[in-house]
Structure formats: structure tokens, C-alpha cells
UniProtKB/Swiss-Prot annotation:
The lineage of its organism: Bacteria, Pseudomonadati, Pseudomonadota, Alphaproteobacteria, Sphingomonadales. It comes from Sphingopyxis alaskensis (strain DSM 13593 / LMG 18877 / RB2256) (Sphingomonas alaskensis). NCBIfam families: PRK05380.1 (NF003792), PyrG (TIGR00337). The active site is at C381, H515, E517. This is CTP synthase. Residues 291-542 form the Glutamine amidotransferase type-1 domain.
Amino acid sequence: MARFIFITGGVVSSLGKGLMAASLAALLQARGYRVRIRKFDPYLNVDPGTMSPYQHGEVYVTDDGAETDLDLGHYERFTGVAARQSDNVTSGRIYQGIIAKERRGDYLGATVQVVPHVTDAIKDFARAETDDLDFVLCEIGGTVGDIESLPFIEAIRQLKNEVGRDNAISVHVTLVPYIAAAGELKTKPTQHSVRELASLGVQPDILLCRCEKPLPDSERAKIALFCNVRKEAVIPALDADSIYSVPVQYHGEGLDSEVLRAFGILDAPAPDLTAWYDIMDRKQHPEGEVTIGVVGKYVSLPDAYKSLNEALVHGGMAHRVKVNIRWLDAEMFERDEDLVANLEPLHGILVPGGFGERGSEGKIASVRFARERNVPFFGICLGMQMACIEAARNTSGIANASSTEFGPTDEPVVGLITEWMSAEGLQKRGANTDLGGTMRLGAYDAKLSPNSHVASVYGTNEISERHRHRYEVNGAYRERLEKGGLVFSGMSPDGMLPEIVERPDHPWFIGVQFHPELKSKPFDPHPLFAGFIEAAVKQSRLV
């Protein structure tokens, strides 16, 4: 039977519960335990797929096509366990399912209520597919005291009673703020947060206290006294210089040992943290550095490109170099700001995924700069589409080339995908289809051209990558684009959908329709990012 670890947050949001869950799971995994992490999101959206990146940050896509919270990216990067649809649920999805059952008459005339119907659905989600696991970590989004999270808190209260106190514990993440004027850390917010959680029937077993200054032993004792936990269960969590040092830091503070003790496990094997020490060494002791420009639409909020940021860091780790990222708003190149001055110092240019016309001409201008100046270029999703439009206009003589996403065009080099094959069979979409959950989502296979650059990067001719798009490069333009030097080096297995383009006459110019950043991990950098950074290192010696 799996044991459950419920992770809540108090005082303020953005305390890093997701990172804490990922780190704890990694520590348990390092001791030989089988783990899985799940996220409960209290918002009423069915999933984050239609939410603005400025509201939510990145949408993380799983192999099975789920659009999920960005925390699942942390979970997967830290544990190597592929996330799936059953690992993320929202209030909206739960209510959608319950209302559908009510309309079908499944409840046989009963009054449908938050308790038991909503709470039972939450518990079913937590317990699903856990027979082969040792630990299931469940992170509850939001902050204790929020109205939206009350059904989730009630559900974990019930679940703790149902599985037994020896099989479920609660870890509460709080803030211990430092008041500079007083020169003190203040524990009162933590006390009040724990009191609020306890009033809902959940007594924390362990407190993880986020703080910017070391937590004195006297303050740990004070928190333990007023929050009804052992002093050893009050774990300080100082700000870290890198997220990749957090697992080792938490182990040093005794988090994993205290969790095991709470379960009565006193003979657990010692953790093997060799891989984490190696990652820390590569991150903290680089042997060089490169500067990568990311020309995007949502650059004012880096969380919108969270996996991309981390994948670039992983590429740097592979070659022991520090990757400096310059976030460049594509729109500034449409306002006649100096393109050369902004792009010339860069060792590589990356155009990431996105939606809509805004900033598209700036991205196309960046692609042209990279092509003409022989600067390593990496285009992802929309970035590949921009590379194809740039090629059509400037090397294939198709002056009016554009995307139907941006409006009517006589030369639709990029257009809406209307049909494709998925694991569920033939998928069909139209211009009036609902936006939510209707894109080409999840893992799809692709075949690479033998002897192509991208095949040498991967070391194979067959790959599987995750997608999230509803527009695709129009295969009818392939011949003209290839005559202009842009080669289609990766296609869907049926040969219908372009997946990868490259320029053989360029030092490193690759565009991909998928999102390789979603599969990159610190101990297993994605080959495309490792290759891109390697090319940037070579470029840095030329600048």
C-alpha cells in the first residue's frame, strides 16, 4: 500500500511547494523508494490550457497529452518519472465530471454536494494507480485559508483517517519573514497558518520554514511549541543559489529523515546523492559561459518559458558552461529598435513557442539575422514556423508568405491542422472548434532523414517528442523551401506533417515543431539543447 504525503502552503503563495515536493521525492527515490507526485489545483479552469501565460506561466504537456501545471515539470525533471494526465487535477475538472454524472442520472436522484461527492472525487484522484508505489506526494495548490482550497483540505483530512495515520502525513510549507527594522525573524505568521490548517482538521506533522536568514534553534523550539510538532520536525529552508542544490540542502536539514520517521520507518537505506552532487558541481563550477538570446512574446514573465529556461541550463551542464539568457521582446524589433545591437553579442538565438500575430515580424527578423550571420539558431514550435516563413520570403521568393493564424493570406506557408492521427485514432479540427484541449497534444513519433544534422544530434532516425500546436507548416511548400536551402529533415511517420527543418549550409540551424524542453532533465540533458549550447560555445570563440 502506498503512503501519502500531503503538502500544503501557508502565509503567502509562491513559497516553492512544487520544488519542495520534487526535492523530497528525489530524496526518497535516492533511497530506493518508488515515488509519484500529484498536483491539486483549486481553480475552476478544467486545465491551464487556455489560461494566459501571464496568469499561469508555462503549460506543461505530458506524453499522454495533458495540459498541466508547470510544477509537473519540476516533478519530472527531479525524479525522471514521466508525468501523466492522472497527476494533475483542478476543481474545474472535478466539477465537470460530477455535473456530467448528475446530468446522466448516475447519482440516482441524490442531492449532489461538496461533501461527499466533491471530496470523494478528490480522494479517488489521489488514490488512482498507486498500487505499485511506495510514496505518493500530493501538493495542494494555493494557500491555506483560501476559499477555493477548502474541499481539498477536507478531502485530505478524510483520506488520512481512511488510510490510517501511519500511512499519511502532512507537510506544511510556511514563511518565516525577516523584519530588517527589528533584525528578527518572525514566527507569528507560521503559528497562525498552522492554527488555520488545524482548525480544518489537518494537523501538520512537519513544517518546512522558508526563510532568508538562518533560523535560530530558539525560534525552532518556539515554532514547535506553538504548532504542536517536534522541534526536529521544524525544518529550515533557506533560499538556495540554484534549484538544483535544494535536494542536497533539504537532506542536510533532515527533511527526508524526518518524513521517514513520521511514517515509523527507521531502517531506511541511506540515499545515493551522487548524481545530485555532480549536477551541483557542474552548475557551480562552469568552465566557460555563453549568452543565448530568447526572442519571444511573454519574456516579461520567465515562468512562461520555465522548461525552456531549465533545458538551456541543462545544455550548459552537459558542456560545463554557464548559460546567460537574454530575454528579448520580439515586438521591440518591430519598433525599429536596433536589431544588430541586440543580437550581435549573442552566441545563439532561440525563438520559442507561442501564439498569435503579435511579435511575429520581430521573430522573423531574428531568424533572418541568425541565418545571414551564421549564428546558431534554434526554433521551437512557432519558432520553426517563423523560420519557414522567413525562408519562404527571403530565400524561396514567396514574398507574401505568412500563417493563417495571423489572418487571411495568399501564401499560407503555415496553416491550421485539420486532420492527424493520434493514439485514439483520426483527429479532426476546424476553425470553430473549442480552444480548450483541442490542439495536437502529447507525444508523437517522427522519422528523421538519414545523414541529416538532426539525426546526428539525436544519434537515431526515430524519435518521440511532445507537441502542443494547432498550426503546422504547409507541406505543399516543401519543394520550394528546400530549393531555397531549408531542408525538411523530420516528418511524421505517415510523411504528412513536417516535424523538423534545418539548413545544411549553416553551422547550426534547426527548427522543430515539438517542444523538446519538456523532456530535458539535469542528469539527462536533451540532445537538441546540448547540441545548441555546444554550437554556441564554438560561436563564442568567434565573436
